């Protein structure tokens, strides 16, 4: 299904019942057997510290009864050098980058975007590509397909903002981090670890996951907001640098 399910917290057999792994009975059976072998107690017995890329994941581990004292939160980092730019000039469009599949919320984005006068550039491929092309026909929505980093940097870097409309949990999505490091604010769904990465009104905005009506309104607000693009980039490049990550990682290790 397309709804977020947490039934395995109370009964791991649900992974078999719902065929949660690739919608395959065999893959789901193997996942169940692995989960039964590597129980929480067995994992805790051989682990000094669990490192989670988001507070969201840390909270889910606590929900699963992992020892809170062993759980640490450390956000992902990226290669900052690849995001550096000479200018932060913007063009009058917004963008999406990611897989074109139902859980990414791309259908909700298309539904909202078709009712708006703003150009939307979509980067990526996936199972919904042909369906989305048909849905976007006659609108100001451009599906660009798969792109390599130099093209992604150019498109995302010049966008007024990037939309991350996920409808399933995201842990610590690099699409948000990379966009901000390019000086591009993010309009993200209020789900998983996405809200932790967005300072509303300063580095982006949030909307209710799956709510096309609210997304439509927020897109208009994003275009109307005078974001400080250079400051977004400089702040993100400092926050998500490898040096900062390694310093925090070393602090965790030396505390053991």
How should these model regions be labeled?
Residues 6-83, 143:
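Donor nucleotide-sugar binding/catalytic pocket of nucleotide-sugar-dependent glycosyltransferases
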Residues 51, 86-117:
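Conserved donor-binding/catalytic core segment of Leloir-type glycosyltransferases
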Residues 165-174, 195-196:
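Nucleotide-sugar-dependent
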Residues 176-177, 191-201, 205-206:
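Short acidic/histidine- and often glycine-rich active-site loop of Leloir-type glycosyltransferases
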Residues 185-188:
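Short hydrophobic beta-strand element within catalytic cores of glycosyltransferases
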């Amino acid at each position: 299904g397309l709804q977020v399910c947490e039934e395995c917290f109370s009964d791991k057999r649900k992974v078999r019942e719902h065929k949660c792994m690739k919608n395959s009975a065999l893959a789901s059976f193997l996942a169940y057997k692995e989960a039964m072998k590597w129980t929480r107690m067995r994992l805790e017995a051989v682990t000094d510290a669990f490192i989670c890329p988001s507070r969201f994941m840390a909270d889910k581990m606590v929900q699963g009864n992992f020892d809170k004292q062993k759980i640490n939160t450390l956000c992902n980092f990226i290669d900052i050098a690849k995001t550096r730019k000479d200018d932060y000039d913007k063009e009058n469009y917004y963008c999406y980058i990611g897989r074109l599949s139902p859980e990414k919320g791309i259908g909700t984005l298309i539904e909202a975007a078709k009712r708006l006068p703003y150009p939307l550039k979509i980067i990526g491929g996936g199972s919904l590509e042909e369906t989305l092309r048909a849905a976007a026909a006659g609108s100001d929505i451009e599906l660009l397909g798969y792109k390599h980093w130099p093209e992604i940097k150019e498109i995302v870097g010049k966008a007024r903002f990037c939309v991350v409309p996920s409808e399933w949990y995201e842990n610590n999505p690099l699409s948000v981090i990379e966009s901000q490091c390019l000086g591009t604010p993010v309009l993200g769904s209020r789900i998983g670890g996405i809200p932790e990465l967005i300072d509303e009104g300063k580095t982006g905005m949030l909307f209710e996951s799956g709510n096309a009506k609210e997304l439509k309104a927020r897109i208009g607000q994003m275009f109307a907001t005078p974001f400080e693009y250079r400051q977004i980039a400089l702040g993100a490049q400092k926050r998500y640098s490898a040096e900062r990550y390694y310093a925090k990682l070393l602090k965790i290790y030396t505390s053991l």
